[in-house]
Swiss-Prot record:
<dbReference type="InterPro" id="IPR029754">
    <property type="entry name" value="Urease_Ni-bd"/>
</dbReference>
<dbReference type="InterPro" id="IPR005848">
    <property type="entry name" value="Urease_asu"/>
</dbReference>
<feature type="binding site">
    <location>
        <position position="248"/>
    </location>
    <ligand>
        <name>Ni(2+) 2</name>
    </ligand>
</feature>
<dbReference type="Pfam" id="PF00449">
    <property type="entry name" value="Urease_alpha"/>
</dbReference>
<dbReference type="InterPro" id="IPR011612">
    <property type="entry name" value="Urease_alpha_N_dom"/>
</dbReference>
<feature type="active site" description="Proton donor">
    <location>
        <position position="322"/>
    </location>
</feature>
<dbReference type="InterPro" id="IPR017951">
    <property type="entry name" value="Urease_asu_c"/>
</dbReference>
<keyword id="KW-0533">Nickel</keyword>
<feature type="binding site">
    <location>
        <position position="274"/>
    </location>
    <ligand>
        <name>Ni(2+) 2</name>
    </ligand>
</feature>
<comment type="similarity">
    <text>Belongs to the metallo-dependent hydrolases superfamily. Urease alpha subunit family.</text>
</comment>
<dbReference type="GO" id="GO:0005737">
    <property type="term" value="C:cytoplasm"/>
</dbReference>
<dbReference type="InterPro" id="IPR017950">
    <property type="entry name" value="Urease_AS"/>
</dbReference>
<dbReference type="Pfam" id="PF01979">
    <property type="entry name" value="Amidohydro_1"/>
</dbReference>
<dbReference type="GO" id="GO:0016151">
    <property type="term" value="F:nickel cation binding"/>
</dbReference>
<feature type="binding site">
    <location>
        <position position="136"/>
    </location>
    <ligand>
        <name>Ni(2+) 1</name>
    </ligand>
</feature>
<feature type="binding site" description="via carbamate group">
    <location>
        <position position="219"/>
    </location>
    <ligand>
        <name>Ni(2+) 1</name>
    </ligand>
</feature>
<feature type="binding site">
    <location>
        <position position="138"/>
    </location>
    <ligand>
        <name>Ni(2+) 1</name>
    </ligand>
</feature>
Length: 569
């Protein structure tokens, strides 16, 4: 067999086993763990290449042939960092491995047949990840959705009804009528969507009615009163209907302290938002909750990574988002109680330790909806620069850290909200919500986004040009965004109760409608690469944080990767 140099191989087929790739301008280096393709039998589209009739393409149609094949993709996922062809059929991932023509090639997987009906997308040299999942959405403006989508987020979970004050402050779509309106509005968008109902209710029939109306879970928020009674009854109904509860705890400790909230939770699973506390929660020690086995702890992106500007920008954000008045002394004291540099500094290291498990945005309510992915990788890079390689790493790479951080916005939020059977990773059988990245732009600007197996967004040049690449090149909606395609390629998530009762038919929904499940039988140990439990303590006077008796903190960064190098403003 004729051999070519490794450099020539990479330029033609992308990196293979043992090759290392830098992510953006970070210090994070991945190493390809294995290559599922067969050397000498790689498939590639183009002039003089192999995807041709009688070569890598079979000439007879079959029920097994793919709709789309991504060739020689470098997959970065919680399942591994490896090279493979990805086959898509009927909107789902049909196979991952070696694609081609079994009649002519060795090692072709049975479910990766390239045939007359197969489109080809050249992924050699590109990184493929699962679409991001943002679980902390204030649905204040619909313009958030395309902004998030362009960043690589393909699923948004939260609540709201538009720019009402309740929505500006809390991620809640309250009541049957509002849920109906939001479920119908969801039809318009290239984005998977799920809505959280109001959990601040101690009368259980009112809670049940919202789940039966299509909510995928509850949000308990202090602005509506995060009392032990509300927490207890909300979790009762969540257990009954198998839905998740997200909570923003009681900053002012009006109805109890963090210990009282944990007592009301009583060991039941709950998803804590902005668990550090600057976004809200028991002052000064809500961060303690992150170490508990039944807590699924998340960060929102205004506090990660910790920089020299973090503290200063939070005051103004807080006053606006929670309808506070700088002329009222008590409102200013409320804001001051939430912004603690010491706990923010600890948050970065708690992510690196795998104690904090999920990242999200808090969109237009202190967080930036288009920066979940970027800020996750900035945090990973900042931590590597400050603390060095993780002890779990093997070889001259950062693969363990990369898997830890990609899990925070893909598989872990999917597990937390009962949608991991459908989305959240690059695995066979899941919906093909995939993001393609050039390594140089990884984490900051995707090349292309495939939604439900069809291209929905891409960087694209002048439509009047003779080729697709002349300037101006920017994100443009593709055919997956238009017409009835968006009904087949996007999911509206609802409760099992609403799904079984026929909510799709009742509301006349055209989109794919699927039920959430397995929300109540999980603990932190089910979260990938971020399952560490620990005893966390906060000094009530200095706000310093200790984990199992050892102080944890980090420095405020002066400069970040994935920042001004890639952006005009």
């Amino acid at each position: 067999m004729k051999k070519i140099s490794r450099k020539e191989y990479v330029s033609m087929y992308g990196p293979t086993t043992g090759d290392r790739v830098r992510l953006g301008d970070t210090d994070l280096i991945l190493e390809v763990e294995h290559d599922c393709t067969t050397y000498g039998e790689e498939i590639k589209f183009g002039g003089g290449k192999t995807i041709r009739d009688g070569m890598s393409q079979t000439n007879s149609p079959s029920s097994y042939e793919l709709d789309l094949v991504l060739t020689n993709a470098l997959i970065v996922d919680y399942t591994g960092i490896y090279k493979a062809d990805i086959g898509i059929k009927d909107g789902k991932i049909a196979g991952i491995g070696k694609a081609g023509n079994k009649d002519m090639q060795d090692g072709v997987d049975n479910n990766l047949c390239v045939g007359p009906a197969t489109e080809a997308l050249a992924a050699e040299g590109l990184i493929v990840t699962a679409g991001g999942i943002d679980t902390h959405i204030h649905f204040i403006s619909p313009q958030q959705i395309p902004t998030a989508f362009a960043s690589g987020v393909t699923t948004m979970i939260g609540g709201g009804t538009g720019p009402a004050d309740g929505t500006n402050a809390t991620t809640i779509t309250p009541g049957r009528a509002n849920l109906k309106s939001m479920l119908r509005a969801a039809e318009e968008y290239a984005m998977n969507l799920g809505f959280l109902a109001k959990g601040n209710v101690s009368y259980e029939p009112s809670l049940r009615d919202q789940i039966e109306a299509g909510a995928i879970g509850f949000k308990i928020h202090e602005d509506w009163g995060s009392t032990p009674a509300a927490i207890h009854h909300c979790l009762n109904v969540a257990d009954e209907y198998d839905v998740q509860v997200a909570i923003h705890t009681d900053t002012l400790n009006e109805a109890g302290c963090v210990e009282d909230t944990l007592e009301a939770i009583a060991g039941r699973t709950i998803h804590t938002f902005h668990t550090e506390g600057a976004g809200g929660g028991h002052a000064p020690d809500v961060i303690k909750m992150a170490g508990e086995f039944n807590i699924l702890p998340a960060s929102t992106n205004p506090t990660i990574p910790f920089t020299k500007n973090t503290e200063a920008e939070h005051m103004d954000m807080l006053m606006v988002c929670h309808h506070l008045d700088k002329s009222i002394k008590e409102d200013v004291q409320f804001a001051d109680s939430r912004i603690r540099p010491q706990t923010i500094a600890a948050e970065d290291q708690l992510h690196d330790m795998g104690i904090f498990s999920i990242t999200s945005s808090d969109s237009q309510a202190m967080g930036r909806v288009g920066e979940v992915i970027t800020r996750t990788w900035q945090t990973a890079d900042k931590n590597k620069k400050e603390f060095g390689r993780l002890k779990e790493e093997k070889g001259d790479n950062d693969n363990f850290r990369i898997k830890r951080y990609i899990s925070k916005y893909t598989i872990n939020p999917a597990i937390a909200h009962g949608i991991s059977d459908y989305v959240g990773s690059v695995e066979v059988g899941k919906y093909a919500d995939l993001v393609l990245w050039s390594p140089a732009f990884f984490g900051i600007k995707p090349n292309m986004i495939i939604k439900g197996g069809f291209i929905a967004l891409s960087q694209m040049g002048d439509a009047n040009a003779s080729i697709p690449t002349p300037q101006p090149v920017y994100y443009r909606e593709m055919f997956g965004h238009h017409g009835k395609n968006k009904f087949d390629t996007n999911i509206t998530f609802v409760s099992q109760a609403a799904y079984k009762a026929g909510i799709k038919e009742e509301l006349g929904l055209d989109r794919v409608v699927l039920p959430v499940k397995n929300c109540r039988n999980i603990t932190k140990k089910d979260l990938k690469f971020n399952d560490v439990t620990a005893h966390i303590d906060v000094n009530p006077e200095t706000y310093k944080v200790k984990v199992d008796g050892k102080e944890v903190t980090s420095k405020a960064a002066d400069e970040l990767s994935l920042a001004q190098l890639y952006n005009l403003f």
